[in-house]
A protein has these predicted regions:
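Bacterial Sec-dependent N-terminal signal peptides
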Residues: 1-21
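Long, contiguous binding/interaction regions
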Residues: 20-231
Length: 231
């Protein structure tokens, strides 16, 4: 009996340790929607992590920002308060609901915080426990089933174009960290695909006139949509 209890305790401790080890892969980006900025902070790895399967309910805390600039973003003096609210929500909801924080979305004077959790019991009270310390702010909280992660994928997660920008920025930051001043010329490979050989030939002529070098032009086997490649 004692061995069984010890084994259960060991398994519980191991699960808790694994849960604590997950830190995510965080980044931020800004896009323009209707000529106004949208600021997004997101855990890029959540959607493919075991956490996504374990937590299939989304909790969205919508907070109205009190002082905003003309573009709808918070003024500098309010950022520290917003950070305190964010930290409070993350600490409390992760503690009482084992909720996973996946990111925030800021636009037009409002900041939305996104959590995913398997447990949503008394969620509103848990949010209130934090926000009652910030009585100057108005807020609402929404909960819904979201097993397909539609809120995470459609609201927080970057498009392919934005993801490329994030990866490019990370590469530049890594080079800076290593002391690279980014002054030396570097070879950059571009791969493009076309529906017709004529389209490829036309494009190749334009880029060659601009100083680019075509290294290879081929045809992808088994590809129907855009089989003609250019490197």
């Amino acid at each position: 009996m004692k061995k069984t209890v010890l084994l259960l305790l060991s398994c519980t401790a191991l699960l808790q340790m694994k849960a604590q080890q997950y830190k995510g892969n965080w980044d931020a980006y800004v896009v323009q929607i209707n000529h106004r900025p949208v600021s997004v902070v997101v855990d890029l790895d959540f959607g493919t992590s075991p956490k996504a399967k374990e937590n299939q309910n989304v909790i969205i805390v919508q907070l109205n920002i009190n002082n905003v600039q003309a573009d709808g973003m918070p003024v500098r003096n309010e950022i520290k308060i917003l950070d305190s609210i964010e930290n409070g929500l993350v600490n409390n909801l992760s503690s009482v609901l084992n909720a996973q924080y996946t990111g925030r979305y800021t636009q037009n004077g409002r900041r939305d915080f996104y959590f995913y959790s398997n447990d949503t019991s008394d969620y509103k009270q848990h949010v209130k426990t934090v926000l009652q310390h910030f009585p100057a702010y108005t807020w609402t909280v929404l909960v819904s089933r979201d097993a397909d992660l539609s809120n995470y994928l459609n609201v927080l997660y970057p498009t392919q174009k934005e993801m490329e920008r994030i990866q490019n920025r990370r590469l530049v930051d890594a080079l800076h960290t290593k002391g690279d001043q980014l002054t030396a010329a570097r070879k950059v490979d571009h791969f493009l695909f076309f529906k017709t050989e004529a389209d490829r030939k036309k494009f190749a002529g334009v880029v060659q006139d601009s100083g680019f070098v075509v290294e290879n032009a081929g045809k992808e086997i088994g590809v129907k949509d855009r089989p003609y490649s250019l490197h």
